[in-house]
Amino acid sequence: IVNPDGAKVINGGGLILIPGIIEAHTHIAVPIPKNKINETDQAYITALSLKVAKGILMRGWTTIRDMGGPSQGIAKAIDDGHAVGPRIYPSAKFISQTSGHGDFRDYNEDHPSMGAISNYYQKQSSIIADGPAEVLRAVRESLRLGASQIKVMAGGGISSDYDPIDSVQYTKEEMRAAVTAAEQWNTYVAVHAYTDDAVRNALEAGVKVIEHGHLINKDTLRLIKRKKAYLSTQ
């Protein structure tokens, strides 16, 4: 190999050089279990997130797609040269229906629309929105905060306490509202969904990316292809 003039030669010590790796699904701003979020100072959580960001870069991941949580500030700190980490595409707040996969209130906490101020939601991790109008507002709020794409909870999950994993979350009308608001910003909606019904409901509303999808069948996979959508299986 002939080195071009002015090229910087780095002694790799016999190691293999590869291009930077892209991580398709992370939650870098949620570095501790969700049940610890409420009782942990936000500055401490951010410090842990910055440590995680540096570790990700040092292990070879140069770009990450962050799929929910207040990572937009971490992304800006890295972009502005104040912290070390990968390029981050943030989703900002998870968007969830009441009793959806992103409704992490304690059992006896009142609903935010009833005047309650949840400690979890003060930390900007997620937002509860019901009905097309509230969903539109929630998407626009995440975009205002700096989201590159929008993350909506479209079905049940493992880490949430009050929704069955086989539940379908959001009506098509609500999901279409999210898609419309995202498309007006020249971006897209990605959804958390495991099951056929949840994935199909999202696809029919115009969602472009399915996150997880571990319980879907071949017919649903074919529908993803027909809709020219994408499946991120992490």
Regions found by a protein language model. Give the residues of each.
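Metal-associated gating/positioning segment near the N- to mid-region
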Residues: 15-80, 98-108, 173, 205
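Divalent metal-dependent hydrolysis catalytic cores, especially in the metallo-beta-lactamase
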Residues: 48-74, 85-94, 147-160, 188, ...
